[in-house]
From Swiss-Prot:
Protein name: O-acyltransferase ausQ
Function: O-acyltransferase; part of the gene cluster that mediates the biosynthesis of calidodehydroaustin, a fungal meroterpenoid. The first step of the pathway is the synthesis of 3,5-dimethylorsellinic acid by the polyketide synthase ausA. 3,5-dimethylorsellinic acid is then prenylated by the polyprenyl transferase ausN. Further epoxidation by the FAD-dependent monooxygenase ausM and cyclization by the probable terpene cyclase ausL lead to the formation of protoaustinoid A.
Lineage of the species this protein comes from: Eukaryota, Fungi, Dikarya, Ascomycota, Pezizomycotina
Additional facts recorded: In A.calidoustus, the austinoid gene cluster lies on a contiguous DNA region, while clusters from E.nidulans and P.brasilianum are split in their respective genomes. Genetic rearrangements provoked variability among the clusters and E.nidulans produces the least number of austionoid derivatives with the end products austinol and dehydroaustinol, while P.brasilianum can produce until acetoxydehydroaustin, and A.calidoustus produces the highest number of identified derivatives.
Coiled coil: none
Binding partners and assembly: Monomer.
InterPro entries: CAT-like_dom_sf, Sec_Metabolite_Acyltrans
UniProt organism field: Aspergillus calidoustus
Length: 502
């Protein structure tokens, strides 16, 4: 292991610090043939990773200018080991083969917290690790779980670590060299343009709640439950095509309201995000009104939803793709739960409908359109969004407060067939995000396929966390039930349409 003095302490950016110290987890499953060789490969790869990026072995402490990453102290007897190996003799891989398809999906229960190297919430007033690893040995393989401190990494930054680790396992001689991920840029994070940009607002007083004042803060939070939902790629493509077929009408409606430029396409990610947010909003409304007779509850509700947006390319100059720090801020949009009577639509609308009732279809199409409009203008508006996020009321970021109806982030652009870990580990069977702890969290998981030839028909796996009452209603929403894999059959595997998935 490299010496702890191999890097200079640095202060985390205001955007890093705004996310707070909470750990999230990536869990990668492998069906290994030689357990000893696999363990040796992982340990060697982690050592090499620390040699190239020694700050990963650091710890986070409070300093004059805020949170700081420094070399670890040597006298911390209770310090969580950097790498742990645990055997679970009564467990098997959390992997399920999806019917006759070539795809694996996460088994429909959350990974046990025992698989995680440390707790999600760190001990207050103590130095906190930057990253920790745990190798979980089960009867038919192993699960490598990586715990990332959100004050140091966002989801994409953590994915850089996974890519570097894969390269360290597969081809250690080339890690960090030309043609591979450049680690040097991540080590100079303190000089990044993002630090200079966000530091402009560092001295602004963030609103602090000295004591909880609203019922939402003081009430006991409802029990949370989470499941991995498997969406049929064929159904989502049909829904996307249907939404795109009515873009002319949606563009005309938007021009009447705001004079916005035309939207040229809606991606599968837009449409899936819209479907998830629409169905969660409907489920929350239904959970609050146990009587499903909408005639007794004619009032509509407006729900705010959030979607994480990567600002690496918006910053001037742009941040490198391998920037590991936080560079994501929320894009906000609203959903109204009111459903009008079935509109009398032209035949073109009726023919475009993929199978949902017309009101649900139009609501999803309009929300997907709103998302695309906001994404198109995000380059001009992200500064305001960033300023707002950095100066948000801290009481609204507490883990027990419902910050939004739904919070969607997507890792779909990460493709497991591009993450080759070498012969000892083999291909990734599933790529999970562990257990989210926020009510309304929706994580679109990485594209899990063994080759690009079948990527186009790979299911969309989404880990969703909701309170129990809302989850019950959510699982009974017709639009959700229609879109899930069990309700459809994939077509012949095909190549991935990158523009469609963007």
């Amino acid at each position: 292991m490299p010496s702890s003095s191999d890097f200079e302490a640095f202060t985390l950016t205001p955007l890093d610090q705004a996310n707070g110290q909470v750990f999230f987890f990536y869990s990668l499953s492998y069906r290994v043939q030689d357990e000893a060789s696999a363990l040796h490969t992982i340990h060697k790869a982690i050592d090499l990773l620390l040699e190239k990026a020694p700050f990963l072995n650091g710890e986070i402490v409070f300093a004059t200018d805020g949170l700081e990453v420094r070399p670890p102290t040597t006298d911390s007897e209770d310090r969580v080991p950097l790498v742990q190996v645990k055997r679970h003799s009564n467990r098997t891989l959390p992997v399920e083969k999806l019917g006759q398809s070539p795809f694996n999906v996460p088994r429909n229960f959350p990974l046990d917290a025992l698989f995680n190297p440390l707790a999600a919430l760190p001990t207050p007033d103590r130095p906190t690790p930057v990253i920790r690893f745990q190798v979980n040995l089960v009867n038919d393989g192993l699960v490598l779980t990586i715990g990332f401190n959100h004050a140091v990494f966002d989801a994409l930054g953590a994915a850089v670590i996974v890519k570097l680790l894969a390269e360290s396992c597969r081809n250690p001689a080339n890690v960090g060299r030309e043609g591979s991920l450049e680690i040097a840029s991540t080590q100079s994070r303190v000089r990044s343009p993002l630090l200079a940009l966000t530091s402009r607002w560092k001295k602004l007083d963030r609103v602090r709640a000295d004591a909880p004042s609203s019922p939402e803060v003081t009430a006991v939070p409802p029990p949370l439950t989470d499941e991995c939902f498997v969406f049929c790629a064929d159904k989502l493509q049909r829904l996307r095509a249907a939404c795109n077929s009515i873009l002319c009408q949606l563009n005309e409606n938007q021009k009447l309201l705001a004079g916005q430029p035309d939207v040229r396409f809606l991606s599968t990610n837009d449409v899936l995000t819209a479907l998830i947010c629409e169905t969660i909003a409907q489920a929350r409304h239904a959970a609050r009104h146990t009587c499903r007779d909408e005639g007794l509850h004619p009032e509509s509700t407006v729900s705010e939803c959030l979607m994480a947006v990567n600002i690496r390319k918006f910053v001037d100059p742009p941040l490198p793709d391998d920037y590991m720090g936080n560079a994501g801020i929320p894009l906000r949009f609203q959903i109204e739960t009111r459903r009008d009577a079935e509109p009398d639509l032209p035949r073109a609308f009726q023919e475009a409908n993929p199978g949902l009732n017309t009101s649900s279809f139009l609501a999803i199409a309009e929300t997907a359109y709103t998302i695309r409009i906001k994404l198109a203008s995000f380059g001009d508006s992200y500064i305001d969004s960033l300023r707002s996020f950095l100066n948000a009321d801290e009481s609204q970021t507490a883990v027990h407060v419902l910050p939004a109806c739904a919070i969607v982030s997507s890792l779909r652009h990460i493709k497991t067939y591009e993450l080759q870990f070498g012969a000892e580990l083999g291909e990734i069977r599933t790529f999970e995000t562990g257990i989210p702890w926020v009510n309304g969290s929706c994580v679109i998981l990485p594209l899990c396929a063994n080759s690009s030839e079948v990527a186009g028909s790979a299911p969309w796996n989404v880990r969703i966390t909701l309170d129990e009452g809302t989850m019950y209603c959510f699982k009974n929403e017709p639009a959700l039930r229609w879109a899930l894999w069990e309700q459809g059959r994939s077509k012949v595997p095909g190549s991935c349409d990158c523009k469609a998935d963007a």
